């Protein structure tokens, strides 16, 4: 367990921030989704087509999210997105999804009883396995820092929030 925990954390530290690299297979999937929804062959897709294309790639974007994405990506103000813009956007989205999955892997290393929360007992065990000699007060402070709903435990959302806040992921 301690080896796995160290591996997950060090792998994330070593990974470059920002744009993640996509495999050729992922790029091909993105190209196929784009082409499928570029029904008129214009080389661009509009907001409605974007939503359908993203769903085909496994995302569930909300209307506001689509509008925001288009305004950030559509630099020429045409209201449409070309393939390069779509690829840039989907690369970022896939990076966010990968980051979340990595954080949840780390969460599961702490939550070895699969309760869905990290307790002070879980934190104490991991600290000991990693050779960290933390006091009860320090452990409690760590829980308190992440705990948003005052239940003295850290759930998945709280863990994701604190990991992103501390830039460990």
UniProtKB/Swiss-Prot annotation:
Coiled coil stretches, renumbered: none
Is Lyase one of the keywords UniProt gives this record? no
Q: Which residues bind Ca(2+) 4?
A: 147, 149, 151, 153, 158
Q: Which Gene3D superfamilies match?
A: EF-hand
Q: Name one GO cellular component term.
A: inner dynein arm
Q: Which residues participate in Ca(2+) 3 binding? A: 111, 113, 115, 117, 122
Which keywords, in A-to-Z order, does the entry hold?
Calcium, Cell cycle, Cell division, Metal-binding, Mitosis, Repeat
> What's any GO biological process attached to this entry?
cell division
The positions annotated for binding Ca(2+) 2 are: 74, 76, 78, 80, 85
Return one GO MF term: calcium ion binding
What else the UniProt entry mentions is: Binds four moles of calcium per mole of protein.
Q: What does this protein do?
A: This calcium-binding protein is found in the basal body complexes (the functional homolog of the centrosome in animal cell). In mitotic cells it is specifically associated with the poles of the mitotic spindles at the sites of the duplicated basal body complexes.
**UniProt record similarity statement:** Belongs to the centrin family.
Q: What protein does this entry describe?
A: Caltractin
